[in-house]
Amino acid sequence: MKHLLNLLAAVALLIWGTHLVRTGILRVFGANLRQLISRSVSNRFTAVLSGMGVTAVVQSSTATALIVSSFVGQGLVGLPAALAVMLGADVGTSVMAVVFSLDLSWLSPLFIFVGVVLSISRKDTAVGRVGRVLIGLGLMLLALRLITESTTVLTQSPTVRTLLGALTSDLLLEIFTGAVLAVLAYSSLATVLLTATLAGSGGIPVDVALGLVVGANLGSGLLAVATTMRSNVQTRQVPLGNLFFKIMGVIIMTPLIGLWLKHVRPYVPDNASLVVLFHLAFNAVVGLVCIGLTGTVARAVQRLLPVADTQAAAGSRPRHLDPSALATPSLAISCAAREALHQADVVESMLLGLHQVIRTDDQKLAEDLRKLDDQVDELYSAIKYYMTKISREALN
């Protein structure tokens, strides 16, 4: 029981470390990363590269998906270019998984020590937030070492071996489990690193680990769809298109697991490296196959989620309250200010219409103005709720 609790604590530490890095990077460099994406979508190849770079820094393809989705929702980026960014984002998170699979545990004490010093001594500055990122990196490396130590002991238990053996006979169960873990951890990177560490320490068979990796990739696509479920139609189109790519990847790579073990395993004796390289291969293959399909998938998504059907209600919806900007308070406040201007435009329309109603006694226009009044109330509530979600600790 003690070793199981140690393992669960290490997994929680890994997830928390990933969260610290993601939020810290977005708070310090969020505006710069958004500018990088917006400037690099002129063609699909630079869009892929920008997605790789941003996700390698943020360590979360879901965060990149939220940023790109908000751009599409505001009409700043076309859907095909946004889908190309997401293909690069998935490759970027795979590259970071390869980096973290290396034995970098010796850097953990250094990162944590320097991070704590910077975070405490320069608390409300950008340097202090960089310290928060270093703490997150240190915790991730520490967690990976603790997971290795815990699983080495746990795998000696007959009960654990029996439970793990139940996974080896059902590939669909492995994919489902990996997807659920990615959604619960809010990070496919953390799930893949956990899986690779377990495989490297003998906690799970390698073929099971590869099935979990396939599921983790599918789970990251589902997570982005779920995160943007309440957003406008244009914003929801990007995660849905990326989910199509993930499903294609599952269809392509699942039958190749056996070939991977047969032809690659002799050259990569370390199981952890074998798992993260398969994760990289998964997203690289998806990127190469799907880079030419971004336009086709974009059209399919637009047919599934047509904008015209919801155009009538568009005026009452917030246009500028970007959820991905919440991690960067300065951007979030700018979004709220723009939405307040949108609200003011609606009020101006009401006042102009009021003069006409007084002069002409137009009952239909009067009814439209009553609806505009409801829109103003809805926008006010949305702005107020959005402002409450801005992280106070990131404000200075």
Stretches found by the model and what they are:
Residues 18-27, 68-73, 114-128, 224-231:
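C-terminal ends of transmembrane helices
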Residues 77, 103-104, 204, 230-236, ...:
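Cytosolic, long alpha-helical scaffolding segments
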